[in-house]
């Protein structure tokens, strides 16, 4: 009986594992192929499409069939052409819809970033929109592949050549040169590519710095006093603690005005360089140029536990220092922008999902950069092209059938290539700090010594401090709220 239960459980587990292994996979219509080799017979490295797969992309398959065509599927099913409303039912046919046994997902490759040298905002934009190989031609071919007409100038027969780039408000317009004559229907109505709504986001991981100029610590003040034991017994169970607040003065300059346009997506902490410890934060969604200096304050302390013989005193010395650091820095800012295609669509074939044939004027905007919405995202539409009705904009399957998968992948990779602009400047900081509290050899005392300028502190057990602290002088050196205390040690 126990064996039967175990066997039943094993069968259930096996069934679950098989169900997981057979989870549905997307069928990309651009990879479907019709073979006329007989019922349920496909070419090498292809297999028949089953009923469920055909149903998931039925509109795409029917769109590729003749009016009264009937073609086979796997397991004794057929799919019928638009004259039969794409009905799928049991039957047989001499041709078969097939799909690769190892289909390519056709993902858009991610290229390395296109780095633009540092400059002001107009410099950065100008360099991008005038780059023929990396920008003008890829965006022109995108418009051409989608079905826009006349994406080139009058003096060239090739897409993306003889293009004019003009300033348009805060953006730029790329359009084929219209000088001289041209032949063809509405050849003077050149497709335009508008580049606008530029935005720049700081990449904190891109930080680099040049040669660091860092001073050795410079002694600015030495404070000397005494720890005095007036009692008849040695004192060693007390901590002498110096506490103070100190500010690190820092500043940064930005070489070009682009920094005013650069924002931080998340809270940004300035990287530590050298020995100067500094905590600088720029809040999320703030301009990089909104904070070019400051004096963050840090509370610090130093302690020592001296042993003072009876009726003795030991010298106590505190040294105060300052240090400074400076270096050139560079960050990268991710550049995003809107790409608006405007023109009329070719009647002989275009990729708008309804494939109009009346040459309509069409405007469409893609966002190159962070995701905004489905309508403007090339990557979203491309990745969901296997779901009929989900992408109500461009028929990317059609572009693949017309131009080939590798061609479209290569073009879209160039269009979506990340763009980064350099942000450069100079950074400097100065900080103050105290060295260790140093103690010297004990000296016998005949009587307590008092000074009007000394800080006289007692632990109440015979140990007291006489150390001169001039608050005004120390504040001028960058040390505030300075205090000395003598307290019983917590871990005697």
Swiss-Prot record:
GO molecular function, one term: toxin activity
Function, in words: Secreted, cytolytic toxin that forms pores in host membranes after proteolytic removal of a C-terminal propeptide, leading to destruction of the membrane permeability barrier and cell death. The pores are formed by transmembrane beta-strands and are approximately 3 nm in diameter.
SMART domains xref list: Aerolysin
Disulfide bonds: 42-98, 182-187
GO BP: killing of cells of another organism
Family: Belongs to the aerolysin family.
Marked site: Important for oligomerization: 155
Oligomeric form and interacting partners: Homodimer in solution; homoheptamer in the host membrane. After binding to GPI-anchored proteins in target membranes and proteolytic removal of the C-terminal propeptide, the protein assembles into a heptameric pre-pore complex. A further conformation change leads to insertion into the host membrane.
Native source species: Aeromonas hydrophila
Cited InterPro entries: Aerolysin-like_C (IPR055267), Aerolysin/haemolysin_CS (IPR005831), Aerolysn (IPR005830), APT_dom (IPR005138), APT_N_sf (IPR037015), CTDL_fold (IPR016187)
Region (Interaction with host N-linked glycan): 68-84
Keywords, alphabetical: Cytolysis, Disulfide bond, Hemolysis, Host cell membrane, Host membrane, Membrane, Secreted, Signal, Toxin, Transmembrane, Transmembrane beta strand, Virulence
Region (Interaction with glycans from host GPI-anchor): 346-355
GO cellular component: extracellular region; host cell plasma membrane; membrane
Name of one Pfam family that matches: APT
Name recorded for this polypeptide: Aerolysin-3
Record's comment describing the protein's domains: The C-terminal propeptide is required for normal protein folding and secretion; it maintains the aerolysin precursor in its soluble form and prevents premature heptamerization and pore formation.
């Amino acid at each position: 009986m126990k064996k039967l239960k175990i066997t039943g459980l094993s069968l259930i587990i096996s069934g679950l594992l098989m169900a997981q292994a057979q989870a549905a996979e997307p069928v990309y219509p651009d990879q479907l192929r019709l073979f006329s080799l007989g019922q349920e017979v496909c070419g090498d490295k292809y297999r028949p499409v089953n009923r469920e797969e055909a149903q998931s992309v039925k509109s795409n398959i029917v769109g590729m069939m003749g009016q009264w065509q009937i073609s086979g599927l796997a397991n004794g099913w057929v799919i019928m052409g638009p004259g039969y409303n794409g009905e799928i039912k049991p039957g047989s046919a001499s041709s078969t819809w097939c799909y690769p046994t190892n289909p390519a997902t056709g993902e858009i490759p991610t290229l390395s970033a296109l780095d633009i040298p540092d400059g002001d905002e107009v410099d950065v934009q100008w360099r991008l929109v005038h780059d023929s190989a990396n920008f003008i031609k890829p965006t022109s071919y995108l418009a051409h592949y989608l079905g826009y007409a006349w994406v080139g100038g009058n003096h060239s027969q090739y897409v993306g050549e003889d293009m004019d780039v003009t300033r348009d408000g805060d953006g730029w317009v790329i359009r084929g040169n219209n000088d001289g004559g041209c032949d063809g229907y509405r050849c003077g109505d050149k497709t335009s590519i508008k580049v606008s709504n530029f935005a720049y986001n700081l990449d904190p991981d891109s930080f680099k710095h040049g040669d660091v100029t860092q001073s050795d610590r410079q002694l600015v003040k030495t404070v000397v006093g005494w720890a005095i034991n007036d009692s008849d017994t040695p004192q060693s169970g007390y901590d002498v603690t110096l506490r103070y607040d100190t500010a690190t003065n820092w500043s940064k300059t930005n070489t070009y005005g682009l920094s005013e346009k650069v924002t931080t997506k998340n809270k940004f902490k300035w990287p530590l360089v050298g020995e100067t410890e500094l905590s600088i934060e720029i809040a999320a969604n703030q301009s990089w140029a909104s904070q070019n200096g400051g004096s963050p304050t840090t509370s610090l302390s130093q302690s020592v536990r001296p042993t003072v013989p009876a009726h003795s005193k030991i010298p106590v010395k505190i040294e105060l220092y300052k240090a400074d650091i400076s270096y050139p820095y560079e960050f990268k800012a991710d550049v995003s922008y809107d790409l608006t295609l405007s023109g009329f669509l070719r009647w002989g074939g275009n990729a708008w999902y309804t494939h109009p044939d009346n040459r309509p004027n069409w405007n469409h905007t893609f966002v190159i950069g962070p995701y905004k919405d489905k309508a403007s995202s090339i990557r979203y539409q491309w990745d969901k092209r296997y779901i009929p009705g989900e992408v109500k904009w461009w028929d990317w399957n059609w572009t693949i059938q017309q131009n080939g998968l590798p061609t479209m992948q290569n073009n879209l990779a160039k269009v979506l290539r990340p763009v980064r602009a350099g942000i450069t400047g100079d950074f400097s900081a100065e900080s103050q700090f105290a060295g260790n509290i140093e103690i010297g050899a004990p000296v016998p005392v005949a009587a307590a010594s008092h000074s009007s300028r000394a800080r006289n502190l007692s632990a109440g057990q015979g140990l007291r401090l006489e150390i001169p602290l001039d608050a005004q002088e120390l504040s001028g050196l960058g040390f505030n709220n300075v205090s000395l205390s003598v307290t019983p040690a917590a871990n005697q």
